[in-house]
Amino acid sequence: MNYEQPPAYTGPGPAPGYPAQGYPAQGYPTQGYPAQGYPPQGYPAQGYPAQGYPNYPPGPPGPYTAQPGYQGYPQPGPPTNTVYVVEQGRRDDQSGEQACLATCWAALCCCCLCDMLT
């Protein structure tokens, strides 16, 4: 395959020089076509206030208060952040045995992992 001159595309579609059926030919639009340019954008001017909304009374001036909760449910109190601190007690009678056992298990696991990886 020559990358400087690739083969012609033979996919589906019209033959070169003929427009696809159902599409107008490219070039100047036919007579009667709408004038060129962009259509007007945005909404038409409605005045103030917008005429589509009823005249509600104005809200209170100044900073607004927080919206109250739904009146059908009781209002919850402030959040309770109860934290229970539990400290595990140490047993002095077997601390040496526990440390030795934990060390042996760690060494055994490391040896098994090294054997599996090699």
Swiss-Prot record:
Transmembrane segments: 95-112
Subcellular location: Membrane
InterPro entries (alphabetical): CYSTM1-like
Stretch list, region Disordered: 1-82
Compositionally skewed regions (Low complexity) per UniProt: 1-54, 64-74
Membrane topology per record: Single-pass membrane protein
Primary localization class, coarse: membrane
Name this protein carries in UniProt: Cysteine-rich and transmembrane domain-containing protein 1
Organism: Danio rerio (Zebrafish)
Taxonomic placement: Eukaryota, Metazoa, Chordata, Craniata, Vertebrata
